[in-house]
């Protein structure tokens, strides 16, 4: 069985733990984009959420990972404009989205 990791969520951000150690951590303010996609061709393929950070790093969160739901709950309260779960999960599973997945959040750069 593949280790899906564990997502730990706090008020300021989140971390991904795999194999008993922290492999990635970020503040909510450093999240640039969230993209949901399937790893594979079939509808039963694992669903992943690619979290792109401001520095270009992409952290992959597995839907089956403990803490994934807590991540989405906190993200919906913290990231303005995040698409509701129902708007992207069912179309992705049904195969009606593009092969590149669905962007569920994108931070708009502020212009001064």
Which functions belong to the PLM regions below?
Residues 1-112:
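Eukaryotic intrinsically disordered, low-complexity regulatory linkers and tails enriched in Ser/Thr/Pro
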């Amino acid at each position: 069985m593949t280790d899906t990791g564990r997502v730990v969520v706090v008020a300021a951000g989140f971390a991904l733990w795999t194999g008993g150690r922290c492999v990635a951590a970020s503040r909510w303010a450093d999240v640039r984009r969230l993209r949901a996609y399937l790893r594979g061709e079939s509808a039963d393929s694992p669903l992943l959420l690619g979290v792109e950070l401001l520095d270009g790093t992409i952290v992959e969160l597995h839907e089956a990972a403990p803490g994934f739901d807590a991540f989405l709950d906190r993200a919906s309260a913290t990231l303005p404009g995040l698409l509701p779960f129902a708007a992207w999960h069912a179309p992705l599973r049904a195969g009606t989205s593009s092969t590149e997945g669905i962007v569920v959040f994108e931070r708009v750069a502020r212009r001064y």
